[in-house]
Amino acid sequence: MTQSRRMLVLRAVVEDYIRSQEPVGSTSLTRDHDLGVSSATIRNDMAALEDEGYLIQPHTSAGRVPTEKGYRYFVDRLATVVPLSEAQRRGINSFLSGSVSLKDALQRSARLLSEITGQVAVVTSPSLAKATLRHVEMVPVAMTTLLAVVITDTGRVAQHGLTIASMPAVDEINRLSNTVNEQCVGLSLSKSAETVRSIAASAGYESVRGVADALADAFESMALDERANELYMSGTSHLAHSRSLTDLAPLFDALEEQVVLMKLMSNLSEETNASGVGVAIGSEMHTPGLLHASVVSSGYGRSGEAGEPAGNDPVGEPETESETESQTNDMEPIAFVGSIGPTHMDYAATMAAVRAVARYLTAFLSEGRTQD
């Protein structure tokens, strides 16, 4: 579809349907939009759009509604993501700035995003696979068991039991802990595992070799365990108020499959468009429960300058598309923020809200306010 007028007609149909959730006719388009052509010409354009698969007519006497293909073209080519207003950004700042820990910030973010969009909001904790080690402590808890407390650069605290054949002296365990902290801080958990195995094989650590091997195994296990990522969800009650989602059972079943949901949104947040968000519509997700839903997702994570806001505005919304793309490229996503709603969701508003909350969490991590 290359005709510019037809693109304008498609955008008008999608925007009107999102607003009214009623089939859109040529008469209302002529009345409500300055398209510069007659109602008959618009009817012809709508018929052509229907033939091309962008619109569908649910009843012969009704107007048209967008198809999945129509929504996709709208999101990719026609939707304009406008940065949030200063008042909206300060509202987000006011609500989220009171966070006292990473967990608190993630829970607040999910609630806030749900309230802004009127849809289900999903926020995940930073992936342990992409985190780096900040500190590890090993504490004997039984004759042959230690508890390893692992703190990452993102503030995640993970605990893992270490089973060994015999318990070394506490001084030897502490010496091993100090060496691991000296050599592994700033390394990924998988790299830390390699380093710990090297320490275990070196002279002077024979008495704690079993402990070191168990700790290395724990690091590797945590790095590979997708279930270790925590998911915070808010706003499922909004689904009951959506007129288009009449059969909610499959959708609720899909929301219960947290590992599947996290994989879907994680992949989506890494395939962002120029606006810094990823959008999946209906059948694109290959998940039966989400057939009539859309998902908007954006990654958040480590950032140098990109996540550091100017002044007292931690949301730091970009003003232009080029600024957004530059900031997105500078940020390494380690978790995601997402919104789930009907296919007739307000894409532009949802994309802006998801992007803003993701940028706040990036700034939150960059400022180091993550200690639980």
UniProtKB/Swiss-Prot annotation:
Keywords: Repressor, Stress response, Transcription, Transcription regulation. InterPro entries: GAF-like_dom_sf, HrcA, HrcA_C, WH-like_DNA-bd_sf, WH_DNA-bd_sf, WHTH_transcript_rep_HrcA_IDD. The keyword Transcription regulation applies. GO terms for molecular function: DNA binding. It comes from Bifidobacterium longum subsp. infantis (strain ATCC 15697 / DSM 20088 / JCM 1222 / NCTC 11817 / S12). This is Heat-inducible transcription repressor HrcA. Residues 296-331 are annotated as: Disordered. PANTHER family: HEAT-INDUCIBLE TRANSCRIPTION REPRESSOR HRCA (PTHR34824:SF1). Belongs to the HrcA family. Negative regulator of class I heat shock genes (grpE-dnaK-dnaJ and groELS operons). Prevents heat-shock induction of these operons. NCBIfam families: hrcA. One of its GO terms (biological process) is negative regulation of DNA-templated transcription. The keyword Transcription regulation applies.
